[in-house]
UniProtKB/Swiss-Prot annotation:
Its EC number is 2.7.7.6. In cyanobacteria the RNAP catalytic core is composed of 2 alpha, 1 beta, 1 beta', 1 gamma and 1 omega subunit. When a sigma factor is associated with the core the holoenzyme is formed, which can initiate transcription. It comes from Synechococcus sp. (strain CC9311). DNA-dependent RNA polymerase catalyzes the transcription of DNA into RNA using the four ribonucleoside triphosphates as substrates. The gene is rpoC1. This is DNA-directed RNA polymerase subunit gamma.
Amino acid sequence: MTNSNLRTENHFDYVKITLASPDRVMEWGQRTLPNGQVVGEVTKPETINYRTLKPEMDGLFCEKIFGPSKDWECHCGKYKRVRHRGIVCERCGVEVTESRVRRHRMGFIKLAAPVSHVWYLKGIPSYVAILLDMPLRDVEQIVYFNCYVVLDAGDHKDLKYKQLLTEDEWLEIEDEIYAEDSEIENEPVVGIGAEALKQLLEDLQLNAVAEQLREEIAGSKGQKRAKLIKRLRVIDNFIATNARPEWMVLDAIPVIPPDLRPMVQLDGGRFATSDLNDLYRRVINRNNRLARLQEILAPEIIVRNEKRMLQEAVDALIDNGRRGRTVVGANNRPLKSLSDIIEGKQGRFRQNLLGKRVDYSGRSVIVVGPKLKMHQCGLPKEMAIELFQPFVIHRLIRQNIVNNIKAAKKLIQRADDEVMQVLQEVIDGHPIMLNRAPTLHRLGIQAFEPKLVDGRAIQLHPLVCPAFNADFDGDQMAVHVPLAIEAQTEARMLMLASNNILSPATGDPIITPSQDMVLGSYYLTALQPQMHPIEFGDRSRTYSSLEDVIHAFEDNRITLHDWVWVRFNGEVEDEDEREEPITTETLSDGTRFEQWTYRRDRFDEDGALISRYILTTVGRVVMNHTIIDAVAAT
């Protein structure tokens, strides 16, 4: 990017999540200071010094690794103020910079022994088990130091690659190997724990295995074929992302920035801390103890037990409770691990990233608005004035009603008539979006033209309810205001409720006449048994146009179910169409009248239709007139 002021979202096209290599993990946490010193490894479990209340060096809140806890001030206080920007204190080794770097600078813990990543081991499906083509139970036995696994069978005739051995079985085989009469020259190699798992994964030649699987799939069927395809899919994904299977075993653990796992002092002098700090502390303590045991060449059984405990500590850090006992803190509350923080409804993604609160939005209960058009919604004035406040202030200043923003805000608080008039001008033609959770399909959020209403409830047209799966028993809906002209245009063109009549899933209409509309349409067009059709010629019931019938009905001269003769030159479908008219009458000038059951036609001497009167009810005229007007309007 040439312009350094471009916003962050313009710096990339997409986000891709892949396995991190050990080098990448080190890269995240390791930094070289301007004085050439390499920092990043967290080696001490301490957090802060309880006397000075300053972070401990090389601990979980170390200022040398993560940056200063106060803006432009080093740990020892030698350098203060912004003029020392970028200097590394020669006494404490802390870089003088802003404290907000503690929100993104990471550290790492170099593990004394490899550990398996619990997501890939205990996830469903278990990718480690699929890749190694071994049962998950067997893989767990290896990782948690219950069984040995054969890494190289050597010359031993009873052993084979990836075979599991108990402690006793391996001791017997060792006795055979080292017996005086042993003929085994090439000794078998066995392993245990995540180190053995890492070796097995390193031995996998992905391209060769994928080729072999494709050949096997071609000649197999049923359950076996499905299993082979499952394994091939995982291997193909590893090949496509250039990831190595052994990266599922960790040599170093990233330590997330300290401001994302804070430690705060309470009123009584006590401290409240994030659970992650306790989990990291367990890992560091066990890792340091293991390193010390390896240094002093402690017995294998003690070292192995410490490795297992390190594995369990890392499991708890990544996903507490996934395997084994859940690690609990004070008052027996399970500690929140990294997985707990990011997964679920209250997790980082759904709560803070997808479901974050946004500006220019509101929320209220919905009520029915029967007088609204389908593309309209009733927006409470109190809500509208808040949502459109910047637009209203801008227009008030532009129209010289007020001189500055402060005066405009005072005027808005008083809710003067001038303000309401300006608000009406602002919202005219400015669509808003209504959303009802859960938004399960595209039609869960639609655009409407707002109409100012009194009260505090949003009014909604009853026909758009099926799309939102809404009813009026206390449901709430959120309002969002599109700001940019492009956003407003998109909302109007693509999201307006009247443009979303068909369901995107099935193609069937999702907006259909319902309840009182269906009943009203039926009542309007129904024939009353007690109302009998009238003969043609009754002047009080004969009209020259549909409009005349409507006017007579509006003047209460006729009722909805009265029969009328009305002049209508369009096509008519008779319910009981006869082959011949009931009567035919020819006049001296050559014109001809044909009387049918529900119509009377007049033809000239050439047989061309001059006029047509139809027998119908007032309700049907009203219905027909309404439909014609609606079609003409579009």
